[in-house]
Design a protein with these regions (language model features):
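Amphipathic alpha-helical repeat scaffolds
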Residues: 33, 139-146, 260-265
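Active-site/ligand-binding-proximal alpha/beta "capping" segment
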Residues: 207-257
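Structured adenosyl-cofactor binding patch, chiefly the S-adenosyl-L-methionine
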Residues: 150-154, 168, 173-181, 239-279
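RNA substrate-binding interface of SAM-dependent RNA methyltransferases
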Residues: 109-112, 126-213
Length: 279
């Protein structure tokens, strides 16, 4: 058991919690909590830490997880935890590098490739019709995490983000995805307008959620390849991005509401596409 914050592993772990640049260089991110750790593909867990009280209270969970863990005293675990109320388990997880093809659903998922699922059950793998959510300068970690969860539930193929959007590997984002971050492909682009034009050139119709949209969102056809553009929480889509869209759409609202939360708007659009594709 590690009982000192002066331990080399603990010093490294504390640095990883505080410095995103270090996490980027290592190609890893941190995950806390038993529910989230359960969601991690086992081959991606680089190192696992548990508190002494967690070990004492959860022997069955630890056995079932089947991953060797380093035990920390409760005090040391609290020192390296990112949360006010530590849940007693923390994992260092290897990142996956996705491509645009992954986001468009044109290749086997990275999880399939890693586990060999595609080879074992080729009939379960199929190229999917693109259903993409495009995020322009999204800044709120909670919103991004919610969009990940919703995208998975609505059947989206992936998420495209401008390079100035919040970091997917921000600990708050990771927590709020509730595990979807391990399964939903995503890709950052430096030139979002060019990326939107590229989607259109590939036959993927792009729809910008916009207050000036002339078309009502549920009157469009999303059964073919589609991408929904969602803007910054306070400012919406930048003009140079919305101008590249094939169509500006709006979500009708009652009362005095001027706009919807970015994650809510994304959910409305993605689930409408999912509904149409289930027919």
């Amino acid at each position: 058991m590690i009982t000192s914050t002066s331990n080399a592993q603990i010093k490294e772990l504390a640095k990883l919690q505080k410095k995103s640049r270090l996490r980027d260089e290592r190609g890893i991110f941190l995950v806390e909590g038993p529910r989230m750790v359960e969601e991690i593909p086992k081959e991606r867990i680089e190192r696992l830490y548990i508190s002494e009280s967690f070990e004492r209270k959860n022997p069955a969970y630890i056995r079932e997880l089947g991953v060797p863990a380093e035990v920390l005293s409760d005090t040391v675990f609290s020192y390296v935890s990112d949360t006010k109320n530590p849940q007693g388990i923390l994992a260092i997880v290897k990142r996956l590098e996705y491509t645009m093809e992954d986001v468009l659903g044109k290749s086997a998922s990275k999880c399939e490739e890693k586990s060999g699922e595609k080879e074992k059950n080729p009939e379960n793998h199929q190229i999917r019709v693109p259903h993409v959510i495009v995020l322009d300068n999204l800044q709120d970690p909670g919103n991004l995490g919610t969009i990940f969860r919703t995208a998975e539930a609505a059947g989206a193929t992936g998420i495209l983000l401008s390079s100035d959007s919040v970091d997917v590997y921000n600990p708050k984002v990771i927590r709020s995805t509730m595990g979807a971050v391990f399964r939903m492909p995503f890709f950052y682009v430096k030139d979002l307008p060019a990326a939107v034009k590229s989607l259109s050139s590939q036959g993927i119709r792009t729809y910008a959620a916009h207050l000036n949209g002339k078309n009502v969102y549920d009157e469009e056809d999303y059964t073919e390849g589609c991408a929904f553009l969602i803007g910054n929480e306070g400012n919406g889509l930048r003009d140079e991005v919305s101008e590249c869209a094939d169509c500006l759409i709006r979500i009708p609202m009652c009362g005095k509401a001027e706009s919807l939360n970015a994650a809510v708007a994304a959910a409305v659009l993605m689930f409408e596409a999912g509904r149409q594709r289930r027919k």
